[in-house]
UniProtKB/Swiss-Prot annotation:
Primary location: virion
Domain of life (superkingdom): Viruses
Assembly notes: Homotrimer. Interacts with hexon protein; this interaction tethers the hexons together. Self-interacts with adjacent proteins. Interacts with kinesin light chain KLC1; this interaction leads to capsid disruption at the nuclear pore complex during virus entry into host cell.
Stated name of the protein: Hexon-interlacing protein
Domain statement: Three N-terminal domains of hexon-interlacing protein form triskelions between hexon capsomers.
Keywords: Capsid decoration protein, Capsid protein, Coiled coil, Host nucleus, Host-virus interaction, Virion, Virus entry into host cell
Positions in coiled-coil regions: 101-121
GO MF term (any one): hexon binding
Gene induction: Expressed in the intermediate phase of the viral replicative cycle.
InterPro entries named among the record's database cross-references: Hexon_assoc_IX (IPR005641)
Pfam families (UniProt xref): Adeno_PIX
Species per Swiss-Prot/TrEMBL record: Human adenovirus F serotype 40
Remarks, miscellaneous: This protein is only encoded by mastadenoviruses, and may therefore play a role in mammals tropism.
The family this protein is said to belong to: Belongs to the adenoviridae hexon-interlacing protein family.
Gene this protein is translated from: IX
Length: 132
């Protein structure tokens, strides 16, 4: 691909191959219509307003779907292995939060017991009036 400028305009000659499936966007999204795009492998993709939205695939659709799922799983596993420290931090943070919650619950039990003791003492000091 080559480009040149004329005044304030820039012109390009040749093909532009994008790794993004922009031709799958609807017409109202501002995407040029009737333009053949390409998928991430460089295979042609019919335009979004085409009557046949198909990919040029080599294998069957089941094989293609299985390969895509395997690729996604491998990518996720690699990401998890690379960011394992992040998961350890999250686990440690959760343990700290559980410890703090345990302290709060213990304190709440102590306060409840003190309230019951005070209520019992108040009941002894002020016997209920007999309304019979």
């Amino acid at each position: 691909m080559s480009g040149f400028t004329e005044g304030n305009a820039v012109s390009f000659e040749g093909g532009v191959f994008s790794p993004y499936l922009t031709t799958r966007l609807p017409s109202w999204a501002g995407v040029r219509q009737n333009v053949v795009g390409s998928n991430v492998d460089g295979r042609p993709v019919a335009p979004a307003n085409s009557t046949t939205l198909t990919y040029a695939t080599i294998g069957s659709s089941v094989d293609t779907a299985a390969a895509a799922a395997a690729s996604a799983a491998a990518s996720t596993a690699r990401g998890m292995a690379a960011d394992f420290g992040l998961y350890n931090q999250l686990a440690a943070s959760r343990l700290r939060e559980e410890d703090a919650l345990s302290v709060v619950l213990t304190r709440l039990e102590e306060l409840s017991q003190q309230l019951q003791d005070m209520s019992a003492k108040m009941a002894l000091l002020n016997p209920p009036a007999n309304t019979s």
